[in-house]
């Protein structure tokens, strides 16, 4: 530990103590908040089922930065490189298309054995795993419908895929000793004016009920459902709207997933957390950065990321909110994208933990909004960076931008050699 870092740390402890914050306790709390990294940043959502196939479902990964992972071995190596540069507890979020098999496997036939390598790898790296059925980039989703499809046979295929995915998710939780959160998102919708908006939602309701009919130990598996405002090719109507899934999660007591990019550009999910928590047992967050639409840019340490973290901490939602990331930028180094986004999420959580929330709440309750605003703004200038650097030091990860040197070396020695 450098003398300069020690001095900054001691000064930071004193500054935060002056406003009633124990920085050691803040770091202990930060170690209770894992962030689930998404595997699909590493290969632009290609997966291993059909890596050369098109990405569909109204989502898009733009850019052609060299060095993307082409198989599971490369993807895990890239993840390990990123993990080494991110302090504190982490998880990994997998999609069904990241299965491994010597022969083709239909999506309704996926089994735990197809993800055994991921589980062994997660054990070795002390990670929890989360999961997602992949209801896009498939011939049977090409017309824009899956779980709400009017054709009963196609609809059943997707029901069976989601049921098989739940068994994989439960296997993750059983093997790793931490529950896997399995999130269901479907692209179902229509491009233009829709006459019958009810029937697809009725079919989706019934399909989801069948999907979750098999009971699993919540210590192993947690169901979540995710809404979206629109997607490319589904601009006019989305079957799984916010109102639909809020009603579903409330009535079935599943977790509700809030994705930062899945709402109107003037809406923010930080404002939805406290409302949803009154009705659902758990929330899954997909922290992202929408630029004019659900563009899934790399997460910044911006106002909304900070507001999301503050909501979790202020309301002590550590055990009810699961923090995941969802972005995929193919225009920059993909390992760096993971590191930037995940470190920013953790920085936001730390800053929230260093806030004198009790004092601010008292000022608010007494109607002293002047002091509330003044202290919130002064809080931004306190030396949280010194606390962050100590956290990185204790977790044997680089402080500041030093991590970029490691990424550049990895790019030169490994990524640049991929064709």
Curated annotation (Swiss-Prot):
Pathway: Carbohydrate degradation; L-rhamnose degradation; glycerone phosphate from L-rhamnose: step 1/3
Location in or out of the cell: Cytoplasm
Enzyme class: isomerase
Cofactor(s) named in the record: Mn(2+)
Binding site residues for Mn(2+): 262, 294, 296
Reaction catalyzed: L-rhamnopyranose = L-rhamnulose
Gene3D superfamilies: Divalent-metal-dependent TIM barrel enzymes (3.20.20.150)
Cofactor mode of binding and number, as noted: Binds 1 Mn(2+) ion per subunit.
Keyword Isomerase: yes
Family annotation (Pfam families): RhaA
A GO cellular component annotation in the UniProt record: cytoplasm
Signal peptide start and end residues: none
Enzyme Commission number(s) of this protein: 5.3.1.14
UniProt-listed InterPro entries: L-rhamnose_isomerase (IPR050337), Rhamnose_isomerase (IPR009308), Xyl_isomerase-like_sf (IPR036237)
One GO MF term: L-rhamnose isomerase activity
BP-aspect Gene Ontology terms: L-lyxose metabolic process; rhamnose catabolic process
Keyword annotations of the record: Cytoplasm, Isomerase, Manganese, Metal-binding, Rhamnose metabolism
Protein function: Catalyzes the interconversion of L-rhamnose and L-rhamnulose.
Family: Belongs to the rhamnose isomerase family.
Subunit structure: Homotetramer.
Name of the protein in its database record: L-rhamnose isomerase
Organism: Salmonella paratyphi B (strain ATCC BAA-1250 / SPB7)
Gene it is expressed from: rhaA
